[in-house]
Amino acid sequence: MSSMERKKFHLSNRHMSEHIDYENIFTPQGMLGHVSKHPNLDFLMNIFNIPRVYSVSGFGTWNVGQHTVAVAFLALYWSAFNAYPQEKRDRLVTLALVHDVHEAVIGDILPFFKTTAVREAIEAIQRDILSAFAIEEDQTLHDELKLLDMMGFLYEISQSSPKGIDPSKRKLIKQMYARQKEQILGYAEEAEIDEEKVNEFLKSMKL
């Protein structure tokens, strides 16, 4: 085996052996392995103490809890806009309320920093919490939930202000807003969600 092959073999083995023992992580509510399976209200409410990455970057003061509630309200508006039956509306709102609940313990992490091991741990924690409430992921609503999540960020950008930094950064906020709106419409097309309807909904929400 050449030195290059040995290096590749070593990296492959290291990648396969990567694992985050999240169950033994201590939290103020107890060991995460227990808390994620039996989440108490203190644990869940911690999302209001977790700053959004966008806020950490210097724009606004939003936390994960505010984002979560915004997405849940958007799910209500979206359901009314589409005249969804009560069962579908309630399902979508429930999923919106818990879509980022794992961030109560891991925080808001940029996708770039989510390694395979980190993603696996996040998914396991999320599954634990959903199972505690007998909530199952609904693939039929996955695309709409993702769309609403993106709209929630668009609303967050619209509410932000460059406090403590050069006012010229307002131009940057406008650019970020325009880019996020483009991404929403692009995702709608990709997910085969009526783009015209999405545009109409955004206008109705003044976004």
What residue ranges belong to the model's regions?
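Post-HExxH zinc-binding segment in Zn-dependent metallohydrolases
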Residues: 121-137
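Post-HEXXH active-site segment of zinc metalloproteases
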Residues: 109-123
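Alpha-helical scaffolds flanking conserved acidic
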Residues: 38, 85-101, 140-151
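Short alpha-helical hairpin
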Residues: 34-56
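Divalent metal-dependent phosphate-bond-processing catalytic cores, especially two-metal-ion Mg2+/Mn2+ enzymes
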Residues: 139-207
